[in-house]
Amino acid sequence: MTVVAQKTALTGCLAPIDKNGLEQLIANGKANPKVVKTLKCKTVAEGKFRHANYIRNLPPYIVDEPPGLLGDDTAPNPSEASLAALGSCLAVGLHANAVHRGWTVSKLELELEGDLNITAVWGTGDVSEKPVGFTDVRVKVDMECEGIAPEEISALVAHVKKWSPVANTYTRPVNLEVGI
């Protein structure tokens, strides 16, 4: 199964981020490079496969499954939400790094797709030995910056991929504890 995240076109100059705030974040990170922040989310089942995810003081972030996976199709499924998190993290990194370099971003779009085998049906179906979860993820970045050559943007994309927290979660082992 291939999951494709829909794209939203943003054209013109992107709303600027606070360059002074960015510089302060950079200084804070350099001053205390070993700091670890714990992020939290509370997931509450609402019925069928629809779940409300409570993060900070924000409205709940809803995750559901499509009808083909017995859901009501009211929101992205968990795998799609994972792609959205990756795309958003990469986009934040691209925008922040462009601003840090003094670039003006006029266009930033990312198209993501990922391949996964869902025959295990969350452990209730075919549980023969095979990879579970995404086996391949592809991200296409369409970024334009005033006066910046495509080669420089490609180098920026590689840099951001290396330093993206969510991309690193995809590409390296993470300690995961699940219990009662």
Question: Where do the model's predicted regions map?
Answer:
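Extended beta-strand/beta-hairpin segments
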Residues: 1-84, 96-180
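Alpha-helical metal-binding/catalytic segments enriched in His/Glu/Asp
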Residues: 85-90
